[in-house]
């Protein structure tokens, strides 16, 4: 990554942090308290929910019979809406269903979970364009509405970016729901397939190249993200009043 690209990326991250600070200052106290309580509950639930062992999953599969794949998909979807590590479900999918069915269940479950989390954020009213009246935020939000799929796709390809964080951030932005869903599905597919194959390898039927896949997808995701950031900044940075506040009152 070149020095200008790193500089642009750093400035963009700083701008996002500044915008989030503005949101915190302008949001009403009940909304802030409610959000903190909600996040705390989600984190506590994620920490307290026990991860089922392989033996427990196999026993569950025997008891449910043909309905087990659907039940597994539903549980995967619901449990990973909070910031619960989805890797356990992804590995279990490969172990229980094999590569093809395991990849399908893991990707569909994760995508459905991401969309639900995104919609929950929007249902609470936490959207930047309604909380912060700045031209820079309005333009960024419009950009995400038009081309947000590329940012989502790039972030999904980077393994170290938290799954839940992308969901919640997308909910606060103007990314279109359908674009978010397709970009999430496509971005999760390579890494999820590698993890499912790893899970399947535990059963003796696969040989994963998880590290290689992670490095390749991460590099591809970073490239797409830097390209989109530089392209956006090139188009908007020199516009007059780029970061001036808008006169209309914020809707809290």
From Swiss-Prot:
Membrane-crossing residue ranges in chain numbering: 32-52, 64-84, 88-108, 149-169, 177-197, 209-229
Which compartment or compartments is the protein found in?
Cell membrane
Keyword Zinc-finger in the entry? The reply is no
Q: Name one GO cellular component term.
A: plasma membrane
Instruction: List the keywords (alphabetical).
Output: Cell membrane, Membrane, Transmembrane, Transmembrane helix
Membrane-topology descriptor: Multi-pass membrane protein
Q: Which InterPro entries match?
A: TMEM64, VTT_dom
Q: What is its main location?
A: membrane
Q: Which Pfam families match?
A: VTT_dom (PF09335)
Q: Kindly indicate whether the keyword Cell membrane belongs to this entry.
A: yes
Give the range the annotation lists for the signal sequence: none
The family note in this entry says: Belongs to the TVP38/TMEM64 family.
Q: What is this protein called?
A: TVP38/TMEM64 family membrane protein Mb1528c
Q: What is the lineage of its organism?
A: Bacteria, Bacillati, Actinomycetota, Actinomycetes, Mycobacteriales
